Amino acid sequence: MNYKISIRYDGSLFYGWAKQPQKRTVQEHLETVFKTIFKINDIKIIGSGRTDRGVHAYEQVFSVNHHQLNYEPQVIYQALCSQIDPDVQILKVQSVHDTFHAQHDAISKTYQYIINDYEFDLFKHNYEYFIHQKINDQKLLEALELFVGEYDFKSFSTSELPLTTRKINWVKITRNTRLEIYINGNGFLKNMVRMIISACIDYVFNKISLTQIKTLLTNPKKGASVKLAPPCGLYLYKVYY
């Protein structure tokens, strides 16, 4: 059977989503749990996409399909919850059609980035980006809105993929004490969100102009924008199907 499973995780102690030799990753941990519970050595899970080291997820989705997995979703859910590490939370398990693919069937994703420009909080430093200067929210939004639309994001990625065109559907910001930035798109390249956030922050503090940002979008060049916002403030917020 094929299952669609939604999870949440604290990325602080993970080396990202994808499996790496001798590293603790979310994918590796989940596959180990499946192997331990269900005694299936060739199990393979497919995520909606990768997150980097230190990046968190409010909702990541993965699919797992194996002929030896033939259980009710609630049984899978309870079994995973009993064995999963405390920095991963199982949100939902659904049985789906055999053709469902967590990555290929995703329509869009929303990322959230949290900035604290108010007061340093020791116990949240792994979960937000602390900036010592106050951010002008309207100015930040002005820069963010430049990215809405379909562009070649080669300037805003470290990806080695040959095709780097993506579409940003919408952006928004909310403010309580902390600043929360939301970016929705049909797909994201490696480090793309963090580079976008970094460029927008640089604009707020007059280190780069809107014209320079537009040039990076209209004349894409790999390595043109090399600054990255820290991973601690970034969350994969929701995956849409």
Swiss-Prot record:
EC number: 5.4.99.12
A Gene Ontology molecular function term of the record: RNA binding
Binding site for substrate: Y111
List of catalytic residues: D52 (nucleophile)
InterPro entries documented for this protein: PsdUridine_synth_cat_dom_sf, PsdUridine_synth_TruA, PsdUridine_synth_TruA_a/b_dom, PsdUridine_synth_TruA_C, TruA/RsuA/RluB/E/F_N
Catalyzed reactions: uridine(38/39/40) in tRNA = pseudouridine(38/39/40) in tRNA
Keyword annotations of the record: Isomerase, tRNA processing
Subunit record text: Homodimer.
Protein name: tRNA pseudouridine synthase A
Gene: truA
